[in-house]
Swiss-Prot record:
Gene Ontology CC, one term: cytoplasm
Domain comment in the entry: The beta-hairpin motif is involved in DNA binding.
Gene it is expressed from: uvrB
InterPro entries reported in the protein's UniProt record: Helicase/UvrB_N, Helicase_ATP-bd, Helicase_C-like, P-loop_NTPase, UVR_dom, UVR_dom_sf, UvrB, UvrB_inter
PANTHER family recorded: UVRABC SYSTEM PROTEIN B (PTHR24029:SF0)
Designated name of the protein: UvrABC system protein B
Beta-hairpin (motif): residue ranges: 89-112
Keyword Cytoplasm: yes
Length: 656
C-alpha cells in the first residue's frame, strides 16, 4: 500500500529504532517514545514505520512551521501515496470575547486562508476514501470539526444513465458548500451552462465535467483546469463537500428546536438570578441567529451551536480530525515535550474565554461545547501513539511501554562541543567568535532572555559590522519562514532571539550557538531547553556551543553531560565503521510554505528609526497577532482599529 521512495537505506540507529517501534505496535503497545537527536533522521524513521505497518497515519506537530517542514519531507518519501496538510485555516484569528470590567464586547475577527481551507478538505476526503494516507497536522487538529457521517452522507454520487436533472445536482452542490460562478477559476466553484455542469472540487487539481441529456447523466469526465481539455472519461463519480461543516435538512430542523429549548431554559435561569439585561441580550442575539438558520441554514458564529447539530449531550467531546480516521490510525506526536503541554492547556484557555460570554448573555452555555478536546479525551481517541522528541517530558517517560533511542546520525556528525565561558567581556568575546564563523561562510545563533537585550545586542552587532537580525520570540508561520530564508541564504550572519532558537529549526549553515545568561535558572534555561538549543548546531561539522555563565547550574551540567554521552556514542560508531563526518547539505524547501501562505514579506531588521506608514502598519499587524495569541483581546481590538484607520489614510493618499 505505502511505497517509500528514498535514495538511502536506514543506517546507524535507524534500523533498530524502526524494528523496535514496529514490533511495539504489533504487540499492542499504546504508548511508545522515540528519543531522536537532531540530525538522526527521525522523520525517515517515522516514514519507515508507516511503510512497514501499512496503516493510515496522523503526524501532529506543535506549530505550523514544523508541520509544513514535515509535510515537505513526507511528500518526498511517499510521492505515490496521499500526504495531506491539516492546520488552522486562519491567517489571523481574534476570537469573540467580553471584558466585564470595561463592559467591552469584541466581535470575532478573522482572516481565512482559502488555500489552507482547500488543503483541509483534501485531507478529510483522503482520510475517508483511502488507507494509504499520511496527514501532517498542527495541534489545532484537536479542535471541533464536522460530523464525519454527515461528510459521507452529503456527498453526491453520479453515474452515467442516472436519472437526475442538472438543476437538482446544482442545488445539492450549493448545499454542500460549492459556489455557483460564471467562471471556474478557483476550487469550490461550479458552473451550469445548458446541459453541461462543470465542477472544480476543493480536494483535487482536475475539474469534473458532467453532460446531461435532458434529465439523464450522459457523460462524466475530468478535465484540465488550464486548457479545459478532457483527461479521463468515468462511469461514476463521488463529489465530496467543499466545506467542513455540512448538515442535513433534518439535522438543521432538529438543531433549531434544540437551540430554542436551551434558550428557554437559560432565560429562566438568568431571570431567576435577577440578570434581566443579560436575559434580554441573550434572547435578542439568539433569536436573530435562529431566524438566519431557519432561512439560510447558516448564521455568524454557527460553530457555537455545534452541539445541537451533532446531537451531543452537554460536555461530550466534539468531532475532530481523529474521528475521520479508521480505528487503527497510527499517531505520531512530534516534539512531544512541547506538544503535550500545549494539548493540556488548549481546553482551559478556550473555556476561560467563553465563561464571561456565557455569564453575561452573549452566548448560550452550549457554546462551551464548541471546543478542543481535553488531553484525556485526546488520549482516549488515539489507539496507539508514538511520542517523538530529542528531550521527552515526564509524561512520555511515565506512560511509555517502550522507549527507543536514536542517537547515531547516518552522516557521522558529532554533537557539538560545549564550552562554558565567563560573562566578563562576553560581548567582545562573542563578536570575535561570530567573525570567525562568518569568515568560513557559516552562520550564528544567539539566544538571550529578554526582547530588550536581543534588540540592543542585535543593534550593537550591526554597529560592529556583523549583519544581524533581531526577532520577536512569538512569530507566526510566515514570519518565521522569512527569517529562515534570510539566515540560510546568507542575507544575515547572525540571529538574536529568545525562545525561537529551540526545537524545529533545521539550519545546517549554523555552526555557532551562543547562550547568554546560561546560569539564570528557569524555563528558558532548563535542561530540556538547553539540549534543544545545543541541537540547533548539530547539523554542522564545525558545530560549537558557547555558554556564557559565572557558574555551572545543575541544568547546565546535565545538558553538558547528555551532550557528551551522545558525542561518545557517535564517535565510537564513526571509528568502528570508518565514517568521516560531513556537514548536512540541505536545499531550501521554503517554497512548500509559500504555496500555502500568501502574505507580503515583512522586514524584521527593525533598525530604521523613521518608519514609513507602510512599515508602521506592518508592525501594528504583528503586534495585533501577538496580542490575540496571548488572549489580550482589548489590546488586539485597539490595534485592529488603528490598523483600519491607517489603511484608510493610505487609500486616500494613493487616490490623491
Amino acid at each position: 500500500m505505502f511505497k517509500l521512495v528514498s535514495d538511502y537505506e536506514p543506517t546507524g540507529d535507524q534500523p533498530q529504532a524502526i524494528d523496535r517501534l514496529v514490533e511495539g505496535i504489533k504487540k499492542g503497545y499504546r504508548f511508545q517514545t522515540l528519543i531522536g537527536v537532531t540530525g538522526s533522521g527521525k522523520t525517515f524513521t517515522m516514514a519507515n514505520v508507516i511503510s512497514r505497518l501499512n496503516r493510515p497515519a496522523l503526524v501532529i506537530s506543535p506549530n505550523k512551521t514544523l508541520a509544513a517542514q514535515l509535510y515537505g519531507e513526507f511528500k518526498t518519501f511517499f510521492p505515490h501515496n496521499r500526504v495531506e496538510y491539516f492546520i488552522s485555516y486562519y491567517d489571523y484569528y481574534q476570537p469573540e470575547a467580553y471584558v466585564p470590567t470595561k463592559d467591552l464586547y469584541i466581535e470575532k475577527n478573522a482572516d481565512i486562508n482559502d488555500v489552507l481551507v482547500r488543503m483541509r478538505m483534501s485531507a478529510l476526503k483522503s482520510v475517508r476514501t483511502r488507507r494509504d494516507v499520511v496527514v501532517v497536522a498542527s495541534v489545532s487538529s484537536i479542535y471541533a470539526s464536522g460530523d464525519p457521517s454527515d461528510f459521507d452522507r452529503m456527498n453526491i454520487q453520479l453515474s452515467t444513465g442516472l436519472k437526475i436533472s442538472p438543476h437538482a445536482v446544482a442545488q445539492h452542490l450549493a448545499k454542500i458548500g460549492y459556489e455557483r460562478s460564471n467562471e471556474i477559476t478557483v476550487k469550490g466553484c461550479f458552473r451550469l451552462r445548458g446541459d453541461v455542469l462543470e465542477i472544480y472540487p476543493t480536494y483535487q487539481d482536475e475539474g469534473i465535467r458532467i453532460e446531461f441529456f435532458g434529465s439523464v447523466v450522459d457523460r462524466i469526465e475530468t478535465f484540465d483546469k488550464l486548457n479545459r481539455s478532457p483527461l479521463e472519461e468515468l462511469q461514476k463519480i463521488i463529489i465530496y463537500p467543499a466545506i467542513e461543516f455540512v448538515t442535513t435538512e433534518e439535522k438543521l430542523k432538529r438543531a433549531v428546536e434544540s437551540i430554542k429549548n436551551e434558550l428557554d431554559q437559560r432565560l429562566t435561569e438568568l431571570k431567576n438570578q435577577g440578570k434581566i439585561l443579560e436575559a434580554q441580550r441573550l434572547q435578542q442575539r439568539t433569536m436573530h441567529d435562529l431566524e438566519l438558520l431557519s432561512a439560510l441554514g447558516y448564521c455568524p458564529g454557527i460553530e457555537n451551536y455545534s452541539r445541537h447539530f451533532d446531537g451531543r449531550k452537554p460536555g461530550e467531546p466534539p468531532y475532530t480530525l481523529l474521528d475521520y480516521f479508521d480505528d487503527d490510525v497510527l499517531v505520531f506526536l512530534d516534539e512531544s515535550h512541547i506538544a503535550v503541554p500545549q494539548l493540556r492547556a488548549m481546553w482551559r484557555g478556550e473555556h476561560s474565554r467563553k465563561k464571561s460570554l456565557v455569564e453575561y448573555g452573549f452566548r448560550l452555555p452550549s457554546a462551551f461545547d464548541n471546543r478542543p478536546l481535553t488531553f484525556e479525551e485526546f488520549l482516549k481517541k488515539v489507539p496507539q501513539i508514538i511520542f517523538v522528541s530529542a528531550t521527552p517530558g515526564p509524561f512520555e517517560y511515565q506512560v511509555s511501554e517502550q522507549i527507543v533511542e536514536q542517537i547515531i546520525r547516518p552522516t557521522g556528525l558529532i554533537d557539538p562541543e560545549v564550552e562554558v565561558r565567563p560573562t566578563k567581556y562576553q560581548v567582545d568575546d562573542l563578536i570575535s567568535e561570530i567573525k570567525k564563523v562568518v569568515e568560513r561562510g557559516e552562520r550564528a545563533l544567539i539566544t538571550v532572555l529578554t526582547k530588550k537585550t536581543a534588540e540592543k545586542l542585535s543593534e550593537y552587532l550591526v554597529e560592529m559590522g556583523i549583519k544581524s537580525l533581531y526577532i520577536h520570540s512569538e512569530l507566526d508561520a510566515i514570519e518565521r519562514i522569512e527569517v529562515l530564508k534570510k539566515l540560510r541564504r546568507g542575507d544575515v550572519d547572525a540571529v538574536v532571539g529568545i525562545n525561537l532558537l529551540r526545537e524545529g529549526l533545521d539550519l545546517p549553515e549554523v555552526s555557532l550557538v551562543a547562550i547568554l545568561d546560561s546560569d539564570k535558572e528557569g524555563f528558558l534555561r532548563s535542561e530540556t531547553t538547553l539540549i534543544q538549543i545545543i541541537g540547533r548546531v548539530a547539523r554542522n561539522l564545525n558545530g560549537k556551543v558557547l555558554m556564557y555563565a559565572d557558574r555551572v547550574t545543575p541544568a547546565m551540567q546535565r545538558a553538558i553531560d547528555e551532550t557528551n554521552r551522545r558525542r561518545k556514542i557517535q564517535m565510537e560508531y564513526n571509528e568502528k565503521y570508518g565514517i568521516t563526518p560531513k556537514t548536512i547539505v540541505k536545499p531550501l524547501q521554503i517554497e512548500i510554505f509559500e504555496k500555502f501562505m500568501e502574505k507580503p514579506e515583512i522586514d524584521y531588521h527593525q533598525l530604521a528609526k523613521d518608519l514609513s506608514k507602510e512599515e508602521y502598519l506592518s508592525l501594528l499587524e504583528e503586534e495585533m497577532y501577538r496580542a490575540a495569541s496571548e488572549l489580550r483581546y482589548e489590546d488586539a481590538a485597539k490595534l485592529r482599529d488603528e490598523i483600519f484607520r491607517l489603511r484608510e489614510e493610505l487609500k486616500d493618499e494613493n487616490y490623491l
